[in-house]
Amino acid sequence: MNLYDVIKKPVITEKSMIALEAGKYTFEVDTRAHKLLIKQAVEAAFDGVKVASVNTVNVKPKAKRVGRYTGFTSKTKKAIITLTADSKAIELFAAEAE
């Protein structure tokens, strides 16, 4: 798996915006990615960023209905990235935080 295929998109929710103040960034990642691969992908994608820890959450699929047909959304994986104290901030979240 290529490092640039690991991170899919940032998660922009109220809870993730509050976690930004503590230096924690939330991304949706590939379901096959493990913590070491996620750490390497974040450090490769953003210059000057050093990852202190990675926490992952498997998000279960939700049941959805379209008319009388029921189906499920896709399962996803979220990664909560904590940066070191001497690390640069990720600029991707700068516009959303303001």
Swiss-Prot record:
Q: Which GO terms describe its biological process?
A: translation
Keywords associated with the record: Ribonucleoprotein, Ribosomal protein, RNA-binding, rRNA-binding
Cystine pairs: none
Q: Which GO terms describe its cellular component?
A: ribonucleoprotein complex; ribosome
- Could you say which protein family the record assigns here? Belongs to the universal ribosomal protein uL23 family.
Subunit structure as annotated in this protein's UniProt entry: Part of the 50S ribosomal subunit. Contacts protein L29, and trigger factor when it is bound to the ribosome.
Q: How is this protein named in the record? A: Large ribosomal subunit protein uL23
Task: Tell me the organism's taxonomic lineage.
Answer: Bacteria, Bacillati, Bacillota, Bacilli, Lactobacillales
Q: Which gene encodes it?
A: rplW
